[in-house]
A protein has these predicted regions:
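Canonical positions in the second alpha-helix
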Residues: 28-29, 61-62, 97-98, 137, ...
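Register position in tetratricopeptide repeats
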Residues: 2-5, 48, 82-84, 123, ...
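Terminal, low-structured helical/coil segments at or just beyond the last alpha-helical repeat
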Residues: 227, 231-258
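Residue-level recognition of tetratricopeptide repeat
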Residues: 35-36, 69, 105, 110, ...
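Structural marker of alpha-solenoid helical repeat scaffolds
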Residues: 31-32, 65, 101-105, 140-142, ...
Length: 258
């Protein structure tokens, strides 16, 4: 109660109603009866004070008790990621435990943890594992996703080398949001990797029709024309990309247009 009031009203000056007073009351309670619930609240207070290592230690007391929960493991992960020099693998391990605690009847709560785990897996370039988590997330929320979900999963599939899977996802994103030029540009990039340059050019045209100043698309158009041995068209596209401020166009002009 003391912590709830003190954290909600920063204008309080009564020393009996401060966060410090709440901590003192908790310490006394722990001395009398070392309950995990007290450590949970102590962890919450320390977290909000920015004392993340201490908060993590308190959350782990809860996690090593018989009242450990998905939430307590998740909060431990959130504290751990804020500790200087933390190990991403440790955070993923805590999220694994949070998800496992959700049991077989996983729901929207588990979906939040899975989404968090995806972000960390991507930072470690664990693309195959991230894709599996995207699939799990999709199932957990009953397929109720926005087009951007397919774009993000496509990025992971692209990096994992699953070009057909990536193409299927970006086309699902396009179907959901046909006026987003980035999706067509991404589709073009996949076609370039597949050496389907004519298909890539069609996707680029769709992107440019929506966003005429999309410099990267002109650069990609130039790359397609280089591969198709059409130097004049390639250089025209590279110069347009440079005109629009694309940072890579100048190098391509030097390589192909001199």
């Amino acid at each position: 109660l003391i912590y709830g009031v003190a954290s909600a009203d920063s204008t309080l000056t009564d020393p009996a109603w401060t966060i410090e007073a709440a901590m003192e009351a908790l310490d006394k309670a722990i001395e009398e009866d070392n309950l995990p619930a007290y450590h949970q609240l102590r962890a919450d207070i320390l977290f909000n004070k920015g004392e993340f290592q201490q908060a993590f230690d308190e959350y782990m007391i809860v996690n090593n008790s018989d009242v450990a929960s998905a939430s307590s493991y998740y909060l431990a992960a959130k504290a751990k990621e804020r500790v200087t020099g933390f190990n991403i693998g440790d955070v993923i391990d805590l999220l694994d435990k949070a998800i496992a605690k959700c049991g077989t009847n996983m729901n929207a709560e588990a979906a939040v943890y899975v989404l968090e785990r995806i972000n960390w897996r991507l930072r470690l370039a664990q693309y195959t594992e991230a894709i599996a988590d995207y699939d799990l997330y999709y199932t957990l929320i009953g397929g109720q996703v926005l087009p951007n979900f397919f774009f993000l999963r496509e990025q992971a599939k692209f990096r994992a080398g699953d070009l057909e899977g990536a193409l299927k996802d970006i086309q699902a994103a396009i179907q959901g949001s046909p006026s987003t030029p980035d999706y067509y540009a991404e589709e073009a990039s996949i076609y370039v990797r597949q050496q389907k340059y004519e298909d890539a050019l069609k996707s680029i045209e769709r992107a440019i029709a929506i966003a005429p100043d999309f410099g990267a698309c002109y650069r990609l158009r130039g790359v397609c024309y280089v591969r198709l041995k059409k130097k004049t068209e390639a250089c025209e596209a590279f110069n347009k990309a440079k005109e629009l401020g694309d940072p890579l166009a100048g190098k391509l002009i030097k390589e192909h247009c001199k």
